[in-house]
Structures are given as structure tokens and as C-alpha cells.
Design a protein with these regions (language model features):
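Conserved beta-strand residues within beta-sheet cores
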Residues: 25, 36-41, 84, 101-106, ...
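Internal alpha/beta loop-helix hairpins
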Residues: 1-57
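Glycine/charge-rich catalytic "coupling/switch" loops of P-loop NTPases
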Residues: 21, 48-106, 136-164
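Short aromatic-glycine-enriched beta-strand elements
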Residues: 48, 113-119
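Short flexible coil/turn linkers enriched for glycine and charged/polar residues
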Residues: 34-36, 74, 112-114
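Glycine-centered tight beta-turn/hairpin loop motif at sheet-sheet or coil-to-beta transitions
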Residues: 53-55, 122-125
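Short beta-strand micro-motifs in enzyme catalytic cores
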Residues: 38, 78-79, 116-118
């Protein structure tokens, strides 16, 4: 088992895979994984995650949406987390899930052999996507990226604990 914590406090104990896939809170989610998990402050509006200044809007899958509504987040703020590898540039994903696509500007592009890290911006929100090197684009380019919301994580903005 692995333990993750802050000074003087254990935040979560579990196998590395459990901690990675099911973090107990935002601290643990951001601590494990490289690049780190992306976090966005959003509002849940009519089944969509709406970013700051309405910079983006993503349709929440039905199962996730039901749980978020049951917990009282419809119309309220929450923190949406997604790992860089759960952001896709592949045409098949973009076509299959058009309601989870954002158009981003690449701030920094790192070609790392078989994969690329794209540091992107949508309005005031910044994030990193880990994509196949075939999807590499130069800094300054625009790119459509799809967020796999079936792998999304949600955190309460006050407690930073995982919502479910």
C-alpha cells in the first residue's frame, strides 16, 4: 500500500493504482501522476460543466450527472479534475463525443518521442494534454481536444474532498 499526505496528516492509504484512480481529495489527485491532474473551477448548469467566464461548456455523461445532481451540485460550483492522458486529440474521439470538445490554443508543445505534452489555454483556463506524437502541433497553434468525461473527477470547492 501507498500513503499520501500533507505534513502531519495522512490523506489516503491504498495501492498506487487505487490512489491514482480514486483519489480521496484534490490534494491526492494532484500529487500522484505526471504531468499532474488538471483542475478547473466550473459550474454545473443544465447538465454541462461551464468554465470561468463561460470559456467552455462540456456535456456531463448521464451517470456522472445523476450523481452530481443527487449531491446537490446542479447550479453550483465544483472543481472538475481530469488527467492529461484523458484528453484526446484523435479524430475518432472528437467525432464520437462532440459535446466534450474544446478549442484550445497551445502555449507550449513538448515532443517526447511516442507522446507529446501540449500545454494549452481556453480563455483563462490552462491545462496540459498528453497526446500521441502524431497529434503534435507547434506552439501557438489551435487544436480541438476532447475531454473523456467518463474518467473525470469532481471535488467540492470548499472541502476539496472527492464528490463521489
Amino acid at each position: 500500500p501507498a500513503g499520501t499526505g500533507t505534513i502531519g496528516r495522512v490523506e489516503q492509504i491504498g495501492t498506487p493504482q487505487e490512489v491514482y484512480k480514486h483519489p480521496a481529495n484534490k490534494f491526492v489527485a494532484g500529487f500522484i501522476g505526471s504531468p499532474a491532474m488538471n483542475f478547473f473551477e466550473v459550474t454545473l448548469e443544465d447538465g454541462r460543466l461551464v468554465g470561468p467566464n463561460r470559456d467552455f461548456s462540456l456535456q456531463v455523461p448521464e451517470g456522472n450527472l445523476k450523481r452530481l445532481r443527487e449531491k446537490g451540485y446542479e447550479g453550483n460550483k465544483l472543481i472538475f479534475g481530469i488527467r492529461p492522458e484523458d484528453i484526446n486529440a484523435e479524430a475518432a474521439f472528437l467525432e464520437t463525443f462532440p459535446n466534450s470538445v474544446v478549442h484550445a490554443k497551445i502555449s507550449v508543445s513538448e515532443l517526447l518521442g511516442a507522446e507529446s505534452h501540449l500545454y494549452c489555454q481556453v480563455g483563462s483556463s490552462e491545462f496540459v494534454a498528453r497526446v500521441d506524437s502524431r497529434d503534435y502541433l507547434e506552439t501557438g497553434a489551435g487544436i480541438d481536444l476532447g475531454f473523456d468525461l467518463n474518467k473525470a473527477h469532481f471535488f467540492d470547492p470548499e472541502t476539496e474532498k472527492t464528490v463521489y
